[in-house]
Structures are given as C-alpha cells and as structure tokens.
Amino acid sequence: MRINYAAVGVAGLAYWVLGGIWYSLLFARPFIALMGWTPEQAAAIQQNGEEPSLAVAFVTSLVLAYALALALRFVGAETARAGALVALALFAGFVATSNLETVLFESRPLGLYLINNGYHLVGMLGMGALLAAWKRREARVPAYQT
C-alpha cells in the first residue's frame, strides 16, 4: 500500500473544514465561554484577522493526515473500519492523553477538553476511514480480442 497523496489532501482538507464547522456552527458559544472570552474579545480576535492561524491550521491538518496515512500503511489497514480503529487507537494513545494534561496542570476546564478532543476524535476517525478505504484507480486496459 502506497501513500495516496490525493487522499491525504482530501483528508487534510476535510479535517480542516470540520474544525471550522466545529468551532463556529456547533460549539462557538460554549468554546468562547470556556475560554473565558467576552463577546467583545471574540469579535476582536475575528477582526484582527485569523488568516495566518487558519493557514497554519490547514498545514497541520495535512501533516496529521500524512502521519495517519503512514501509520495506516505501516499496519496494513485497507478498509474504512480498520482505518477508523487505527485512528481511534492513535487518538486515545496520543491526542486524548497528551491533551488531558492541559486540564490537570493548566487548570483548563474539562468542557474545553471535551470540545477540543471531540473535534480531534471525529476528525481522526473520518480521516482514518477515508485514508484506508480510498483506493487508487488504476487504468483498465481491455484485453485485445480477436
């Protein structure tokens, strides 16, 4: 199984778009409240331009997609289910555990941890499924018939 760069690009883009939906449409109000921002502070952050942060977030989404594709290749996951299970294991083993330290040692609210890690969990499950199941189309040359 080779790395499918088209799948990595689509998976990274999907993860990035999910982040936009997650933190705007789905969880904007609780996220802002848990961050301790006033509505004015949140508006100021938006007005000051989020483009550099969004660009970096897109690049990190691509890096995550590529790293996940490497892990899937290493374990030989070739179905959506297998890809999602590998992503779940990586999420539980690295993301959820590492981010829990922000609750324990930085006094961040548990709700913020749940919002942030819910995004990573849903995103990684989707990326794992997509990356493992996406099959590269091969050109089919019909057999010569006489």
Show where each model-derived region lies:
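Juxtamembrane/disordered regions of integral membrane proteins
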Residues: 1-146
